[in-house]
């Protein structure tokens, strides 16, 4: 055989001598030919995945979402490594109306010392741990010990709160509350250590809380623990309710409990495979990858419903049930493979945006999509043939609810196809305007669990002494004096003043605060020695080359306000001749980093749309098919983004994720519709309009059923305790709801209106179904009957 001949055959395989599923449906054909071998493989892989499921856990590290996402994460990591930050600290708010009574003050002092001795703490900062020079080369407690008079305590605390820059951030102005900050041991808090640390701290404070003293915890570790608890609760809720709703809807649609259980079995196994694989590859779920199991669940339900509907229709057409299984694999398999590829592309496109969290979500989703297709092509045929042997009897008919919209859809398509098509095209083009104008928007509050007690406590601290959402400025110094020379001290003082002018008086701490002591005659070395090496590192590096200025902002601040603040502070520092200063912190990372990630994801969404439309056109070897699929699938995505734009919600992280994945899934129904339409034209010889009507009758009910299952399964997500996850569910459901309008009304109208334009589709060379011989179907018969969703005849 010549090289040219080999090349021609290879080229033909790539272009037209193949199915629309690029041959991936041969996984199903292999199952039909070698059922025992495939059954063993399915069993072995299931055992592997089941072995990993008991290890399932959710990683509460918020940094996993932003890790390696770009310059803002790198700056935060460098800042944390150089100085340590307050982002991992636990804030303890102690409140008492009798705080100025000596007995109460000493009890709070004991609490502060107990927290310092906690196994998980490497240090604390509180009014009791701060010390000041005594003028004799030693230091004494900033809050004097041994006071036994109410007035003496009140005068001492008031003096510290009003005159000591550090104490202003730890003692409330009305002297009714104090903030104690616990610095955790980062090595001990890795993995499940944070949960154990919080439990240990709660155990410590429980001894001191009574009717006189109220103690509450807040800070990033508490926030993430609440988010983690909400995420775990969500995972259980989504899985249980998703299965329950899917099964109930399948029961109502098929009007048969055994048939509903058949629809449910494949999604159950697909979710188990997906969970086991995520744990195998990533070790744990993140706040993003936990959504993947719900997506795999609902997509599996949708594909299972398509498979069961087609199988029952063949059976009702009079085909022998085992042969009907084979025929369904050959007809549905190529379309299912193509829908898997479009969803796979939607997930995979997200990996182009930097960030460990997004890339893990993309990889987990892509793997889950492929696994559910494999499950559909292996487990489903094996299960159906097994239940046939056990005497399964199909339901006599499906629910009339599923087919109720079909006569209206055909009436509109046949009578008003052209005006509806023109309107759909014009509206879709106009919706491109808000798509290009919409901007990222970030709200830190949306990341936290709803009704967060820790958030309420943080807001109380904001109102009292400062904030628990620090903004940091890393200031490069010219000298190398570990105790800071006069020139460098002036640089620190100037940055301190600039930041304080923007976030409020007494909301900033830095080495400049020490001037309160140096002005009374103490040297900087004496003052630095008195605060101790741990606190010293929060002000300046050991070699004196860098300083840290920390501003405590309100916990809840809009992203627009924060961006403007950073811009103004940067401009003023540059005007003051301070070069190389770097602003960072968790709030800066989540605000600017999220904007960067969201902008990248918006480009990924655009790329996903273009690639998927191109993939559909290439799969069918027809640009006409790509054009036919464009409007019904662009309309729901662009419509949802327009709603976000006009309501001022903007783009958020989960917004773009939801739209990208929803587009990939919405394309599924379109692919199944076009596949059946072209099968009717090419292989059954139907006319153009007859093929449109036959396709609408044959799979319209399945499209309605799958959309109901998809929306019902994901609507559970809208009740998540995490606002970002709830928003994901809301947008996902609304996009799919619009998509069913596109597939049942707009797509048939486009096909009907473009009769001459779509006429050549009857001559496409790629196969919409396979005709390979299998044991129960040696002739490769995939001709569909004329009885629509219900088939031509009732099986006995």
Where are these regions (language model features)?
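Signature of alpha-helical transmembrane segments and their immediate interfacial
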Residues: 5-60, 381-386, 390, 394-443, ...
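Juxtamembrane segments of multi-pass membrane proteins
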Residues: 65, 71, 77-78, 82-85, ...
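Extracytoplasmic
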Residues: 77, 106, 149-256, 493, ...
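Interfacial segments of transmembrane alpha-helices in multi-pass membrane proteins
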Residues: 233-285, 352-356, 603-648, 719-720
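Pore- and gate-forming transmembrane helices of large, multi-pass membrane proteins
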Residues: 235-237, 264, 303, 316-353, ...
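Hydrophobic, glycine/alanine-rich multi-pass transmembrane helices and their short helix-loop junctions
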Residues: 249, 337-378, 613-617, 639-650, ...
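Hydrophobic transmembrane alpha-helices and their membrane-interface caps
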Residues: 259-307, 625-674, 742-745, 752, ...
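Hydrophobic alpha-helical segments
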Residues: 270, 274-390, 720
């Amino acid at each position: 055989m010549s090289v040219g001949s080999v090349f021609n055959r290879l080229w033909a395989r790539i272009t037209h001598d193949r199915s629309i599923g690029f041959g991936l449906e041969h996984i199903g054909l292999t199952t039909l030919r070698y059922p025992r071998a495939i059954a063993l493989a399915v069993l072995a892989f299931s055992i592997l995945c089941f072995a990993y499921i008991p290890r399932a856990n959710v990683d509460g590290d918020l940094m996993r979402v932003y890790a390696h996402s770009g310059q803002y994460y790198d700056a935060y990591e460098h800042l944390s490594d150089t100085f340590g930050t307050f982002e991992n600290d636990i804030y303890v708010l102690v409140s008492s109306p009798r705080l100025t009574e000596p007995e109460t003050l000493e009890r709070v002092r004991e609490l502060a010392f107990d927290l310092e001795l906690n196994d998980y703490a490497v240090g604390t900062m509180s009014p009791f741990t701060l010390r000041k020079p005594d003028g004799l080369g030693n230091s004494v407690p900033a809050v004097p010990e041994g006071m036994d008079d109410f007035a003496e305590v009140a005068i001492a605390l008031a003096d510290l709160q009003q005159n000591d820059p550090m104490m202003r951030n730890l003692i409330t102005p009305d002297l009714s509350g104090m903030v104690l900050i616990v610095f955790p041991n980062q090595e001990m808090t890795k993995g499940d250590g944070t949960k154990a640390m919080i439990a240990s701290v709660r155990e410590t404070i429980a001894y001191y809380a009574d009717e006189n003293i109220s103690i509450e915890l807040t800070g990033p570790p508490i926030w993430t623990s609440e988010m983690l608890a909400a995420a775990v609760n969500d995972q259980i809720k989504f899985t249980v309710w998703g299965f329950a709703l899917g099964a109930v809807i399948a029961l109502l649609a098929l009007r048969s409990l055994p048939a509903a259980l058949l629809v449910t079995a494949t999604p159950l196994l697909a979710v188990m495979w997906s969970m086991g694989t995520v744990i195998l590859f990533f070790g744990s779920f993140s706040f993003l990858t936990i959504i993947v199991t719900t997506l795999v669940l609902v997509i599996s339900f949708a594909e299972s419903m398509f498979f069961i509907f087609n199988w029952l229709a063949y059976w009702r057409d009079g085909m022998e049930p085992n042969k009907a299984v084979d025929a369904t694999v050959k007809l549905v398999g190529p379309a299912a493979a193509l829908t898997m590829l479009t969803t796979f592309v939607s997930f995979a496109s997200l990996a182009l945006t930097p960030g460990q969290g997004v890339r893990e979500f993309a990889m987990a989703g892509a793997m889950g999509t492929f696994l559910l297709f494999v499950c559909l092509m292996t487990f489903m045929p094996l299960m159906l043939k097994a239940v046939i042997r056990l005497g399964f009897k199909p339901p006599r008919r499906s629910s009339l609810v599923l087919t109720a919209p079909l006569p209206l859809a055909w009436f509109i398509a046949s009578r008003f196809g052209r005006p509806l098509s023109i309107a759909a095209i014009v509206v879709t083009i106009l919706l491109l305007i808000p798509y290009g104008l919409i901007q990222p928007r970030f709200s830190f509050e949306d990341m936290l669990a709803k009704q967060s007690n820790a958030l309420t406590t943080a807001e109380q601290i904001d109102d009292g002494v400062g904030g628990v959402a620090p903004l940091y400025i890393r200031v490069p110094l010219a000298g190398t004096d570990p105790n800071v020379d006069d020139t460098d001290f002036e640089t620190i003082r100037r940055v301190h003043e600039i930041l304080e002018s923007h976030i409020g008086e007494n909301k900033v701490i830095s080495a400049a605060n020490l001037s309160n002591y140096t002005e009374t005659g103490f040297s900087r070395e004496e003052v630095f020695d008195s605060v101790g090496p741990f606190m010293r590192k929060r002000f300046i590096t050991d070699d004196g080359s860098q300083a840290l200025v920390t501003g405590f902002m309100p916990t809840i601040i809009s992203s627009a306000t924060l961006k403007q603040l950073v811009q103004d502070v940067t401009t003023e520092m540059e005007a003051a001749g301070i070069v190389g200063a770097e602003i960072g912190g968790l709030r800066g990372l989540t605000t600017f980093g999220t904007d960067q990630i969201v902008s990248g994801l918006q480009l990924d969404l655009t790329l996903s749309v273009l690639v998927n439309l191109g993939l559909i056109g290439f799969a069918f070897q027809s640009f006409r098919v790509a054009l036919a699929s464009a409007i019904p699938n662009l309309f729901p995505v662009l419509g949802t983004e327009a709603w976000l734009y006009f309501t001022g919600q903007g783009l958020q992280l989960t917004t773009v994720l939801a739209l990208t994945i929803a587009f990939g899934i919405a394309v599924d129904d379109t692919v199944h519709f076009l596949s059946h339409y072209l099968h009717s034209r090419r292989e059954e010889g139907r006319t153009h309009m007859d093929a449109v009507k036959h396709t609408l009758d044959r799979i319209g009910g399945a499209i309605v059923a799958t959309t109901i299952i998809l929306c019902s399964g994901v609507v559970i997500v809208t009740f998540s305790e995490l606002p970002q996850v709830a928003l994901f569910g809301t947008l996902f459901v609304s996009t799919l709801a619009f998509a069913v309008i596109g597939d049942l009304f707009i797509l048939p109208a486009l096909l009907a209106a473009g009769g001459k334009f779509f006429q050549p589709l009857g001559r496409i060379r790629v196969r919409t179904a396979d005709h390979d011989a299998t044991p129960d179907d040696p002739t490769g018969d995939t001709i569909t009957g004329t009885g629509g969703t219900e088939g031509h005849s009732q099986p006995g």
